[in-house]
Amino acid sequence: MDRISQLSDDLLLQILSFIPGKDVVATSLLSKRWQSLWMLVSELEYDDSYHTGDYKSFSQFVYRSLLSNNAPVIKHLHLNLGPDCPAIDIGLWIGFALTRRLRQLKINIRTSSNDASFSLPSSLYTSDTLETLRLINFVLLDVPSSVCLPSLKVLHLKTVDYEDDASLPSLLFGCPNLEELFVERHDQDLEMDVTFVVPSLRRLSMIDKNYGQCDRYVIDVPSLKYLNITDDAVYDVRQIENMPELVEAHVDITQGVTHKFLRALTSVRQLSLCLSLSEVMCPSGIIFSQLVHLNLSTVVKGWWDLLTSMLQDSPKLQSLKLIDKQHESGLCGIETPIGWKLPSSVPECLLFSLEAFEWIGYKGRRGDREVATYVLKNAACLRTAKFSPESTDVGEKYHMLKELASVPTASTSSKLLFD
């Protein structure tokens, strides 16, 4: 303890910021110096799942801790609460933190005793200091008519509830400097028909698992650099109006992809796709002139035709990775049909730029061998070809390796790697 006490106050406060609030307060018993030091901690976390007594004692502890806090600014407040926590207490705790120029707020209401979600205090929607807001589970986004969050740059909404489909656009309209938005929906009852324009947004992640729900999104994000969309909603409709600055995109969509949607991705340098070409209505004429890295999932029907199209339309492609995500999705990679439609001529990227080819979950079936053989025979600049088979059988893996090693390669310097 003597060594720790020799550390500076700033360093000790930084250490205290990493431990739960209950333990922070307990340090006041160590010495006179610690009696006042814990009151200056600016990053506060309260989690009732660690509390062993009744809820009343937990509530009193939080009130006492907040009222004793003398930090000039509360940088971070994290509330992880269960069904016993009254909404009035949560609102008062958040309101107090806002008066101390709160910078970051994270609220996770794990479950609700009466299936009612917690509504945020109206003062939160007009905070001029809040920079990060993360809301999780039983939180209701009941947005007032006036929203002004000039400092908010990061907004995460994970499986929260919405008062109506105007809630999200209204909130975004009041965030003129928002840079990162994460939205995740799971089986929410409310159908969303959302149009939002966020000129400042640079990162957008949307995960929608509303199976059978008919949601519609129209997105205008001219400054976007990063896009991640995972969508299992069968009848979902999405439209992206403007993404000229996009650099990286990850798209995993069940249905509803349009030609216009793919055209909005043509500026990317890194692209991950899990979709069927039949969903895109044959995207001829779309050139991915900046694309360098392409990841393609093999768990959707027609992935081989999408591969053909992407090879033809990505003249600068340097890295190609085929991924069987069976372990993640529970789906098995679909075998390439015998005699799949080859490119009409050897794609430019195979002749002049492709340097790395990788196949994760390679099964060695006849159709799969055709795809692998085509790439190996035509990729003149290939440096590495790496195959990670799904099988753990040594004999089967050896047979796959022997087949691949017998393929004549266009590149004299390529290395065949086999995990």
Curated annotation (Swiss-Prot):
Coiled coil: none annotated. It holds the Pfam family F-box. SMART domains: FBD (SM00579), FBOX (SM00256). LRR repeats lie at residues 55-81, 132-159, 160-185, 187-208, 226-253, 254-284, 299-324. Residues 1-53 form the F-box domain. Residues 339-389 form the FBD domain. Keywords: Leucine-rich repeat, Repeat. It comes from the Eukaryota. InterPro entries: F-box-like_dom_sf, F-box_AtFBL13-like, F-box_dom, FBD, FBL13/AtMIF1-like, LRR_dom_sf, LRR_FXL15/At3g58940/PEG3-like. The keyword Repeat applies. This is F-box/FBD/LRR-repeat protein At4g26340. The lineage of its organism: Eukaryota, Viridiplantae, Streptophyta, Embryophyta, Tracheophyta.
